Amino acid sequence: MPTRSRSKANQRRRRPRRVVVVAPSMAQPRTQSRRPRRRNKRGGGLNGSHTVDFSMVHGPFNGNATGTVKFGPSSDCQCIKGNLAAYQKYRIVWLKVVYQSEAAATDRGCIAYHVDTSTTKKAADVVLLDTWNIRSNGSATFGREILGDQPWYESNKDQFFFLYRGTGGTDVAGHYRISGRIQLMNASL
């Protein structure tokens, strides 16, 4: 037995070790690097426009409340107001309204909403076509085709109103989280 283990040990000692050689990579001639393309178009357009995302919270409001959220120079959103003061023309191209319910499980009713591009309607005139249940969350997204048909709006004129009317009780129903995208053109100097 000892001879067998000794012979294996001798074989291991006699085995030549492998040598690994790593060849260096061939160097490529350096070419002059070009400036990277700007892929994100937001922030500065070809026609001198500028794009800004905005967000705000509206509420809380009761289940029987009616209200108007204005989008333009008379908006409650400071981001919109500040940017409109710096530019001559604007257009809101995208809007998302998320209704966050704070109502109890026993509350009844719904919240009706409407986008008014004429900026003349009252919240009490909202028809119960588009609604959210007062007890559950909901969201609605509006594109350029719904938000207005003019290419650009003067910065002293509202583009549209978001009207809502509740059919619930006097308890707190919830609030809105509103986000959107506004394009601005012709900076005021």
Curated annotation (Swiss-Prot):
One CC-aspect GO term = T=3 icosahedral viral capsid
Q: Which UniProt keywords apply?
A: Capsid protein, T=3 icosahedral capsid protein, Virion
> Is Mitochondrion given among the entry's keywords?
no
Q: Where is the composition biased (Basic residues)?
A: 1-18, 32-42
Instruction: Spell out the residue ranges making up region: Disordered.
Output: 1-50
Domain of life of the source: Viruses
Q: Which Gene Ontology molecular function entries are recorded, alphabetically?
A: structural molecule activity
Where located?
A: Virion
Main localization category: virion
Outline what the protein does: Major capsid protein.
- Misc note: The N-terminal region like those of many plant virus capsid proteins is highly basic. It has been suggested that these regions may be involved in protein-RNA interaction.
Q: Which family does it belong to?
A: Belongs to the luteoviruses capsid protein family.
What is the protein name for this chain?
A: Major capsid protein
